[in-house]
Amino acid sequence: VLNYEISEESLPGIFKDIDALLDGEKLDLIVGGPPCQAYSIAGRSRSENKMIGDKRNYLYRLYAEFLKKYQPKYFVFENVLGLLSAKDEDGSLHFDNMRTLFKKCGYTTDFRILNASDYGVLQNRKRIILIGVYGERADFYPKISAVEDTHKVGELFCDLPAIKAGEGVITP
């Protein structure tokens, strides 16, 4: 797992670090996604210009640079539902532009809207999960089965002492 702030200027250094870790091996999978603020409906509603011109809207282009360089068999790209409606300055949808760019990199893509609560996470968190496969393939998106959740948040915290606001210990 690598965690970097990605920019055009930082790409060469990031690639150098990845190349050193790979030591000649190929990547099978890249997983990641840009920050959601530029695509989120909440972010757009708070922004005077609706996030138009925000550089974060275009971080998917840097993601594509990783796909071009490493050509993994698959990639997984995650983001908020607002990505489906976020528009570029010319009125085109960022999501459509993104998928077009990934296709130019050699990938067939498909996506689903998944809710984390269906897979054992104790919160409703719907996300777009875009999967790409290198080359032309049909029907490659995995069949993902929901898990039966038998836990509730209250059950997880039932053995902790009750505290009020301002009580407790803050540890560094």
Regions inferred by a protein language model and the residue ranges of each:
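S-adenosyl-L-methionine
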Residues: 1-21
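Class I S-adenosyl-L-methionine
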Residues: 20-24, 39-172
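N-terminal Rossmann-like NAD(P) cofactor-binding module of classical short-chain dehydrogenase/reductase
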Residues: 29-31
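Short glycine-/small-residue-rich Rossmann-like dinucleotide-binding loops
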Residues: 35
